[in-house]
Design a protein with these regions (language model features):
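Short, flexible, surface-exposed loop segments at domain boundaries
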Residues: 2-8, 12-15, 19-63, 67-131, ...
Length: 170
């Protein structure tokens, strides 16, 4: 065997072993369970009920809509107040809270998709307890478009029982 042939065989063997078998296949996960990041920010402006939040460490400024502010208990927020923010792996804001409230009031519901509203308003799940319908947060709605009926999912719900995130599989 020549030196070039050995070199080619060794290179091919390394490439075959280095590339995982499913590298070309898309992931089944929409968002991993541990992919949430919590940080705080300061409200710099409130305009027409919209909260504008400045965050440290060069992170992009955030906004909280009037509907979300009411739902998460920030309807009496003031400029200069520090609040906690929770984002998913796609850097999308999924929850906000005053600093005296943490995020452990989230709950998870597992089931199969029975119906996902094309306008992202609600999702229906078949669970062992029966069919359940949940309102969908406006920022989480785009995740519904990739969920076919019958797909096994786990929904993450906030304290108001609104879907804020979805995870494929159970």
């Amino acid at each position: 065997m020549t030196t070039i042939t050995r070199w080619v065989l060794a290179t091919v063997a390394i490439l075959v072993l280095a590339i995982p078998a499913g590298a070309g296949e898309p992931s089944q996960d929409i968002v991993g369970f541990a992919a949430h990041h919590e940080f705080s920010g300061v409200i710099t402006k409130i305009e027409s009920g919209m909260l504008f939040i400045h965050t440290d460490y060069g992170l992009q400024p955030r906004t909280v809509s009037p509907n979300k502010a009411d739902r998460v208990g920030l309807h009496n927020a003031q400029v200069g107040e520090t609040i906690n923010l929770l984002v998913d792996s796609g850097n999308v804001l999924i929850d906000a809270a005053s600093t005296d409230r943490a995020f452990p009031d989230h709950r998870f519901v597992a089931g199969t998709v029975r119906y996902a509203d094309p306008y992202w308003q609600e999702i229906q799940l078949s669970t062992p307890e029966g069919t359940s319908t949940f309102e969908v947060d406006a920022l989480a709605g785009n995740k519904l478009s990739v969920l076919p009926e019958g797909a096994p999912v786990t929904l993450e719900l906030d304290a108001a029982n609104v879907m804020i995130d979805v995870h494929r599989g159970r």
